[in-house]
Each structure stands twice: as C-alpha cells, then as structure tokens.
Amino acid sequence: DYVYSSTCPCSLELAEHARATRGQLATPHSQRSVARLSVVLTDEMALEDLIELARDAIVTETQVMVKREDEQAFAELNAANPIFVEDAARLFCEALRADPRIGDFRVIASHQESLHSHDAISLLTEGPTFAADSLDPRLFQGLIHAG
C-alpha cells in the first residue's frame, strides 16, 4: 500500500471562489488516501523501485513526522496537486504501464473522505491476471473507513 494525501478539486475550487467573491476564508478538504498496487513482474524489480514509481505518480506521500514549516510546505504541495480518486488511479496505471518490468497489474485507490460519510474508491486492472477477482470484497479490507 502507498499512503498519500489528496485534496478534493471541487472543494479547492469552491474555497477559492468563496475567497474571491465574498472574502470568506474557506479551507478545501483533503484526506488520507491509499493506493493498493498489485503487480505481476516480467523482470526483476526491487520493492524500492515500485515505491519510487508510486511517489513519482502522486507526489503527496504522507509523512510520519514533520516540523511545523514542513507541514505548511506539504499543505501547499497538496493544494497544488488536487486530485479525484479516479484520476489518481489513472496516474498510477500510467506509471505502471510505462515500466517494462511490470506486466499485469491492479490499482485500487481509496480516498478516505474527511467531509463525506463515504469513501471514494477506484479500481483499475490491466491484463487478465487480476480481472476475475477484481470485485472480491476482501480486496478492500483496510481501505474503507468503518465509522
């Protein structure tokens, strides 16, 4: 699993509109997000290479510990890269597809919503390996907030 943060593009646009038209301070909502990447390798690949591939696709990987100024820089990075869950899944797919060491793959992206009472999930597969079990509910364990 690759854990990243995502800012809702709609929420960001509405916050900017409120600030521009009414001078109202509004904060776009962002949330912790998880991409579960499953791959079939056609050649050797270190786990670190797969992690780097995910980091290159979505640059807002969550941080374990940050200083206050680093937290602000991360908030700015997050706001500069708003993304819907479907678009995040597509970016991961593009990165996986571009690596010749990767054959079939499955991407499950989950944006664990901070505003809505539901999570947003996108699932994409490439090749026959993962197609048959792509809707098995066990795939989503740990990706869905149960609360």
Where are the regions that the model predicts?
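N-terminal intrinsically disordered, cationic/polar leader segments
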Residues: D1-G147
